[in-house]
Every structure is written in structure tokens, then in C-alpha cells.
Amino acid sequence: MSWITPDLIEILLSILKAVVILLVVVTCGAFMSFGERRLLGLFQNRYGPNRVGWGGSLQLVADMIKMFFKEDWIPKFSDRVIFTLAPMIAFTSLLLSFAIVPVSPNWVVADLNIGILFSLMMAGLAVYAVLFAGWSSNNKYSLLGAMRASAQTVSYEVFLGLSLMGVVAQAGSFNMTDIVNNQAHLWNVIPQFFGFVTFAIAGVAVCHRHPFDQPEAEQELADGYHIEYSGMKFGLFFVGEYIGIVTVSALMVTLFFGGWHGPFLPPFVWFALKTAFFMMMFILIRASLPRPRYDQVMSFGWKVCLPLTLINLLVTAAVILWQAQ
């Protein structure tokens, strides 16, 4: 058939890759919510969800059905358009952040030359979703949570971006695939250890995960910026948070731990195992650390993380200039 051209086949394969990878990311985010509840129960010497299915295996399905049939209520005093758009923007921006992550040599949705900048741009877009949700709800607790989230995310995105500049300088490219190929013999976590530490801290803060979950602090803000949300709108925020964890874990693997590189096993398996390890670390951090005060979080970022990233950049620049001579 003459209408089947190589360009059409390439487009269809790209669409197939995008659908498969994005479905896997959404599924991983959903299953992580169940795994987190089970592991937190184990860490705290109690039972997790164990009533639906064998060992609670169908709890995720039950939660999805319950959330789907809940009333999609919009407060009368809210801005309906922005209130509805906020969870969609949050979910979409976090999902698109994964599009530039190469899971194997031939599997990447968008192999952009500005991959890192695109990821940072999507992380910045998620801030607007939180701000829209808090402001449009017309609720004082929602607005306070949104203001906290905006200030925290914008601050820690500075450290997130600066921590990656050392990796970019070493690889000589913003392209994720080039960065992974540059780690074929030595992972970036060794020469860029301080950059990795700062990126890990900033990644947890940008995801609003414990101990940086002040925007959702139940004891202070009654669940923060999504207090007025219910039904699938709340579900988009909920699943989006776990997709953010999957994305940050995948970025850690790609930028600092060699991506798909590893012996014996297929590249995709190595990438999945490394990503799963960092997803487990998110859960362990939640079970282990207390929540600090909000002023302590901001002070830690500007007084500890920022100097650490600047020192890392100066050392990286000095080493690169010394090697060039």
C-alpha cells in the first residue's frame, strides 16, 4: 500500500512508545500508593490495607472505583473554570516531565536537545496548578497552602536547576541520552556527589513529600491547597503526586546513576530496578523523618542547599578547566 511510508511508520512507532511509557508511569504511580501504605504499615509494626483481595491486592481497584463514583463537587464560592483546570494542569505537567527520560537506548518519548530545560519547565508549570487550586477555592486554608507550596517550590527549583549544571557541564549537552551515554564508564554520582545530594533534597521538596509537605500539613492547614477538591479532581492531584515521585526517581537514575547502564540484565530492567530503589527511598524517608517548621525548610534551602550547589559548580568548573589544559 503506497500510503504506508517510512515517515508514517516512524510516527506510529513514536506514538506507540509514548502511549506505552506514559501508561507504565501512571500505573507505577497508582501502584506506589498501595505499596506505600503496605510498607508504612510494616515500618510502623501494624497492618496495612489487607481486606480487599488476597493480602489487600485489590485495594487499589477499590479505591479507584470509590473515587470515580464520589460526587464531583465544586464550591459555590469558587472560580469554576480555574478550579477545574488546576488538577488537569498538575497531572499533565508532571506526566509530561517523564517524556524526556530515556528508559533504554531506543525507548524515549521525546529525545530533545533541551531535555533538562524541558523537565525544569514542566516542574515550574506545576507551581501554577497549585497556586490556581489554592486561589480558586476561595478558602483561607487552601490559599495558605498554595502560598507555602509556591514559595517552597520556586525556592527549591533554583537548587534543583543549579544541581544539574555540573552534570550538563561534564556531558557537554542538555540531552538526556547524551548524559546517559557519558556515564558508560563512570556514573555521575561519584564526581557530582554534592550535586546529587542537592538534587535529591530539592526533588523531595518539589514533590511536596515528607518532610517537605508543609503545603499539605494536616495539623496546620487541614490538607492544604486541595481541601475543597473531591472525586476525580482530587484523584488527579493524588495520582499526580506519585507520578512526580516516579519522575524524580527516574531523573535521579538518568542523571546520576548511569540510566540504563548495567551488566548482564537488559537495559530496561536496570532502569526499572534503579528507579524502584529510589521510589522506596521516598517511602522510607516518609516513615523515618519528622516534619520541620516551614521557616526551617526555607532557611535550610537558602543557607545550606544554595551554598552546596555553588561550591559544586565552582569545583566542577575548576576540574573541567584543569582537564582542558
From Swiss-Prot:
Membrane-spanning residues: 11-31, 50-69, 81-101, 114-134, 154-174, 186-206, 237-257, 265-285, 304-324
Pfam families: NADHdh
One cellular component (GO) term of this entry: plasma membrane
Entries under PROSITE patterns matching the protein: COMPLEX1_ND1_1, COMPLEX1_ND1_2
Source superkingdom: Bacteria
Protein's job: NDH-1 shuttles electrons from NADH, via FMN and iron-sulfur (Fe-S) centers, to quinones in the respiratory chain. The immediate electron acceptor for the enzyme in this species is believed to be ubiquinone. Couples the redox reaction to proton translocation (for every two electrons transferred, four hydrogen ions are translocated across the cytoplasmic membrane), and thus conserves the redox energy in a proton gradient. This subunit may bind ubiquinone.
UniProt-recorded name of the protein: NADH-quinone oxidoreductase subunit H
Gene it is expressed from: nuoH
